[in-house]
Every structure is written in C-alpha cells, then in structure tokens.
UniProtKB/Swiss-Prot annotation:
Similarity remark: Belongs to the ABC transporter superfamily. Phosphate importer (TC 3.A.1.7) family.
Protein name: Phosphate import ATP-binding protein PstB
GO BP annotation list: phosphate ion transmembrane transport
Subunit structure: The complex is composed of two ATP-binding proteins (PstB), two transmembrane proteins (PstC and PstA) and a solute-binding protein (PstS).
Protein purpose: Part of the ABC transporter complex PstSACB involved in phosphate import. Responsible for energy coupling to the transport system.
PANTHER family membership: ABC TRANSPORTER I FAMILY MEMBER 17 (PTHR43423:SF1)
EC class of the enzyme, as a word: translocase
Subcellular location: Cell membrane
SUPFAM superfamilies for the chain: P-loop containing nucleoside triphosphate hydrolases
Listed EC numbers: 7.3.2.1
Amino acid sequence: MAKRLDLKGVNIYYGSFHAVAEVTLSVLPRSVTAFIGPSGCGKTTVLRTLNRMHEVVPGGRVEGSLLLDDEDIYGPGVDPVGVRRAIGMVFQRPNPFPAMSIRDNVVAGLKLQGVRNRKVLDETAEYSLRGANLWDEVKDRLDRPGGGLSGGQQQRLCIARAIAVQPDVLLMDEPCSALDPISTMAIEELISELKQDYTIVIVTHNMQQAARVSDYTAFFNLEAVGKPGRLIEVDDTEKIFSNPSQKATEDYISGRFG
C-alpha cells in the first residue's frame, strides 16, 4: 500500500487537442497532495490520467512517463483494469449502486475479481466500512440499499468501496463539492486518517480545504483559451499558501482570479 507516483514530461491529448502540457511532479506515499487551479486548467484531466480513466474518452492519449513505484502504468501489456484497481477513484458526486445493499456496494469490486467466499466478503465489508468511518452508522442495516443513505454517508460508502480492493493510491475529484458542511468535515477528517495507509491526491476548488487537508499543493493554470493547461508550481502546502514562488499562484489563492 501507499506507493509513490512520478510524472515526467506528461502531455495529455484528446484527439488533436493538447489538453495539458509538460507536467513533471512527484506524489509522495502516505501524504495528501491537492491539485488546485481555475476551471479548465487541466487538474482533473491530470487526476484521471493517473489511473487511465481519461482513456474512456475517445482519442485520449498520454505522452511522457507516469510511474507507480518505478512501474510504468502506460507500459506495454499493462492492464488498465489492474491500474484502476491499484489507483482507486472517488468521484465528485456520490455514486453508489442505489438498489444494491450497503454490504454489496462495498464488496462489488471483489466480486468482479471472482471472490465468492462469504466470510472474506463480510470481513472486507466491515474492515472497509470501519476504514471509511461508516461502520457504526450502518452495521445494523447492511442489507438495506446504499441509495437510502444521506449524501455524506453515500460518499463515505464510495470511499469504503474504493479501499475494499486494497489500492495503493486514492484519487478524489472534488469529493465534498456536493456535500453539506457537516458531511464535508467528516470527509476531511477521514482523509487525514486514510493518508496513514494510502497515497491520496485530491482535486478541489476550495482553497481552505486544500490548506486544511493536504501536505503538498500543486497549482495548475491555463495560459489562454485553447492553450494547454500547465503545472505552475508544486510545494509544501504551507509554503504555497504563505509564500508561493510564482505570482500567478499568489493571485489565484488570494482570489484575484479564478
């Protein structure tokens, strides 16, 4: 668990459109790295590239090197499904299988892998729900539909589903944007706990959230409409928010644009 990601000279295309240019950065294990920047700057595109989710869009391709603990996840013969198992994704809006039970939501990935042993499935469901700080709230209704949970609980259910397959990295695409403040606080506390076991990358438009939950922050920006997004700087979160090295970063986090 908790592996390192290294991007070297990564360029991302959709057909002839150059979406993101020349990204080089390292994401360290057992830490939270926040991707920030204005809409359209490429931060979510880069996030999706980390587990090859961008490939579901026709024409999506990557140039450059993207390593998971020195293994090229775009190397010849590498199975994208295996990559997505090692690098899990939690999306912007909670997306549990609404008619499926809470228990079956959590172990859906294991069942797809062919696991049928009930004891293993039950133990994994409990372990994952505890890991997502949801067990005590749902342990007496595991057979009820996941769609019946509140929005915040559904998002934690999705996190439990992601960690059930024991990934090395967790990607989170604005995981709190659709949640109320209390649910947001619960997710932020959970992120701080999960980083003890996982490498976490989070995309957020909330500067206060980035400052609260992340150890490192990467700022992306767009030169102009039609131009590719670029990584402007990446550093310790405290430095990015107190003394950034680039004026564009300072302007963005101070609210002058974006």
